[in-house]
């Protein structure tokens, strides 16, 4: 390796905030199912603390050995609706508490997988789990929840969409003392993936190995600095620059994943190529788009800039790593991105523009605060719109929205840490009540029939 490449890597880490956002251990709980809920919970706790006992220590050892910051160590598990569904329990909050206790015991930041997959319909376990989400998130610290309400193959389960509007509303009310923090740990998906290392949407799919390591990289600051060097150049050059930068970022992710996998004796799964921002200055996806020539993110041209960024990151990342997966795109969470927050405050960025950007990026309406009096039906309709974009375009989309109790447009909602600060954004005041009340399923699109 040439000296200038070594110096470049050091600069990327020290000055441009390059880091590994997360090492996530996926753990299958299929062998923990039991007709007795208490027995199942004991098995779950035992398996998690056994498998993940050294996860944090290994992460810290890799940090000091390679000098690469690893921000989060996390766990994802098999959707609890599947595991708890075999028990006779009529409420699953105790399962959430078990996950929380296991996460605290091994020292991870978050544990994901308090989840249900209801894109086509409900099982008994799904019904109980979804009903228990508000209490589960109110009574735990580190548990994250997700529900998949649609897929390109099956269409959109509008009964689930309607219920999730109510669940989000109830979760916000139950966690009102922390400005609706519970909602920041709840994601509603269409086309959810089984190997996502990022929270709050991570769960360990049933098609996955017993235990696996997935890595999420992050480097918005590095990409912005690279684009600064090609100011005024045509888009071909910009795309090539982003591609080469993404290659370097992903190589580091692969290295960390492989080393962690060897040290833990667990198979290496995937690197997720998503560019994930933080509230820190110089770690913003919005600022990358602005560096391409936009006065402020949200103006005309924003969606095109995001398309170029997302595609170039994937092209560079795929070349750098044998197995990529997860969500693999750009994240645009409003509260976690200094540039997004500023654009909302200046009136340049609104919900409708964010929805358009969703057609390109990984998640969509992410970490968005809306007024506390937003109705459950309006929240459900927002979910339906996002799910439709995902289902029709055969991609993952999601909603993580916080109707913080007692807030109005222009207020600021403080979550702290990586979750940041969200300005409360206006929603369309016209009603979607009759639309959401219909229920049923929106059929799968015609182009989903590929067999």
Curated annotation (Swiss-Prot):
**One Pfam family hit:** DUF711
What are the TM regions of this chain, as residue ranges?
none
Q: Which domain of life is it from?
A: Bacteria
**Where does the secretion signal sit in this chain?**
none
Q: Which Gene3D superfamilies match?
A: 3.20.70.20
Matches recorded under InterPro entries: UPF0210
The family assignment reads: Belongs to the UPF0210 family.
Q: State how it assembles.
A: Homodimer.
Q: Which PANTHER family match?
A: UPF0210 PROTEIN MJ1665, UPF0210 PROTEIN SPR0218
Question: What name does this protein carry?
Answer: UPF0210 protein Lm4b_00560
Organism for this UniProt entry: Listeria monocytogenes serotype 4b (strain CLIP80459)
């Amino acid at each position: 390796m040439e000296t200038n490449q070594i110096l470049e890597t050091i600069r990327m880490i020290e000055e441009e905030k390059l880091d590994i956002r997360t090492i996530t251990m996926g753990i299958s709980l299929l062998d923990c199912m039991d007709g007795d809920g208490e027995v199942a919970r004991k098995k779950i706790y035992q398996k998690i603390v056994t498998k993940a006992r050294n996860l944090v220590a290994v992460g810290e050892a890799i940090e000091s050995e390679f000098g690469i910051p690893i921000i989060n160590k996390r766990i994802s598990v098999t959707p609890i609706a599947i595991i708890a569904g075999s028990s006779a329990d009529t409420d699953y909050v105790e399962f959430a508490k078990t996950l929380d206790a296991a996460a605290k015991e091994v020292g991870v930041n978050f544990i994901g997988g308090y989840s249900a997959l209801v894109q086509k319909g409900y099982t008994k376990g799904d019904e109980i789990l979804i009903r228990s989400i508000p209490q589960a998130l109110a009574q735990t610290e580190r548990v994250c929840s997700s529900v998949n309400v649609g897929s390109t193959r099956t269409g959109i389960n509008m009964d689930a969409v309607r219920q999730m509007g109510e669940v989000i509303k109830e979760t916000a009310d139950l966690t009102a003392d922390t400005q609706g923090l519970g909602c920041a740990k709840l994601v509603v998906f269409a086309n959810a993936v089984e190997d996502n290392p990022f929270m709050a949407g991570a769960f360990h799919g049933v098609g996955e190995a017993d235990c696996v390591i997935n890595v999420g990289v992050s480097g918005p600051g590095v990409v912005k600095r690279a684009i600064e060097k090609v100011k005024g150049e045509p888009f071909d050059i910009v795309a090539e620059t982003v591609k080469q930068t993404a290659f370097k970022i992903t190589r580091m992710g692969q290295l960390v994943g492989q080393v962690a996998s060897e040290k833990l004796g667990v198979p290496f799964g995937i690197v997720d190529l998503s560019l994930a921002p933080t509230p820190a200055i110089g770690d913003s996806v919005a600022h990358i788009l602005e560096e391409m020539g936009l006065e402020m993110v949200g103006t005309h041209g924003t969606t095109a800039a995001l398309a170029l960024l997302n595609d170039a990151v994937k092209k560079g990342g795929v070349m750098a790593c044998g197995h990529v997966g997860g969500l693999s795109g750009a994240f645009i969470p409003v509260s976690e991105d200094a540039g997004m927050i500023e654009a909302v405050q200046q009136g340049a960025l609104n919900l409708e523009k964010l929805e358009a950007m969703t057609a390109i990026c990984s998640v969509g309406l992410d970490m968005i605060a809306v007024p506390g009096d937003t109705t459950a039906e309006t929240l459900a309709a927002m979910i339906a719109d996002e799910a439709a974009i995902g289902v029709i375009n055969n991609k993952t989309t999601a909603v993580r929205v916080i109707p913080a109790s007692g807030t109005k447009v222009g207020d600021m909602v403080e979550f702290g840490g990586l979750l940041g600060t969200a300005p409360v954004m206006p929603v369309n005041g016209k009603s979607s009540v009759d639309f959401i009340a219909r229920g049923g399923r929106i059929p799968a699109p015609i182009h989903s029939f590929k067999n």
